[in-house]
């Protein structure tokens, strides 16, 4: 991490945005966010981020905001309960590369707590200033018909993520007033909670992206 940071500083870049730090790498094993042993120990990551901070830089870690690996040991006892269910009670799934995931319900307190705690813990434990929540501002919202969930009706998807963003930001900034959140792409109801947005495919895939860009230049 320090070596990569120093290389970035040669180009005037002081922000390290780190993905694939978790066990098994990118788009795999979510939401189990533990350092991949090939990259070193958890303390190695702490030392690396501390070196970045001491050099006047800052770091952001990637966390996916909605996926649960179906092959995870914890999917059946934990993940299935958190999943969005359709009208027939079936879980919604998506596939990225060879890995298939369930879609977690952001308007249910179970997934809210898991996501909030994971983000806040990562920021505190590793000395991060930022947390990036992938897919949050980009992926399609879905209705959830699971009657065991805490949401009052089937259409609270976006309101659930507003609570998640608000609570993560509040807790992170209580520990570090300069802490921030980022999301993939952007949305008007999420924008006031974020410091930045990764908008790599918004123009091609997100509805009303050009209207958003015009309104919020």
Each language-model region and where it sits:
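Glycan-recognition surfaces
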Residues: 70, 74-113, 159-217
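Aromatic-lined carbohydrate-binding/catalytic grooves of carbohydrate-active enzymes
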Residues: 2-116, 126-130, 136-150
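Extended, polar beta-sheet/loop recognition surfaces of beta-rich domains
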Residues: 154-156
């Amino acid at each position: 991490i320090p070596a990569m940071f120093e290389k970035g500083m040669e180009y005037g870049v002081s922000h390290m945005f780190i993905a694939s730090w978790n066990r098994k790498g990118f788009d795999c094993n979510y939401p189990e966010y533990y350092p991949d042993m090939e990259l070193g120990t958890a303390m190695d990551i702490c030392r690396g981020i501390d070196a970045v901070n001491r050099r006047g830089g800052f770091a952001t870690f990637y966390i996916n905001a909605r996926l649960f690996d179906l092959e995870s040991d914890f999917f059946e006892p934990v993940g299935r309960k958190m999943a969005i269910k359709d009208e027939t009670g079936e879980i919604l799934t998506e596939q990225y590369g060879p890995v298939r995931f369930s879609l977690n319900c952001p308007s249910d307190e179970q997934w809210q707590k898991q996501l909030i705690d994971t983000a806040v813990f990562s920021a505190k434990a590793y000395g991060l200033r930022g947390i990036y929540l992938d897919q949050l501002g980009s992926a399609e919202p879905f209705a959830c018909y699971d009657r065991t969930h805490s949401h009052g009706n089937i259409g609270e998807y976006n309101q659930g993520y507003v609570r998640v963003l608000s609570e993560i930001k509040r807790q992170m900034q209580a520990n570090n007033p300069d802490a921030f959140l980022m999301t993939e792409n952007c949305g008007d109801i999420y924008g006031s909670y974020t410091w930045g947005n990764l908008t790599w495919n918004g123009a091609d895939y997100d509805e009303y992206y050009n209207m958003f860009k015009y309104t919020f230049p």
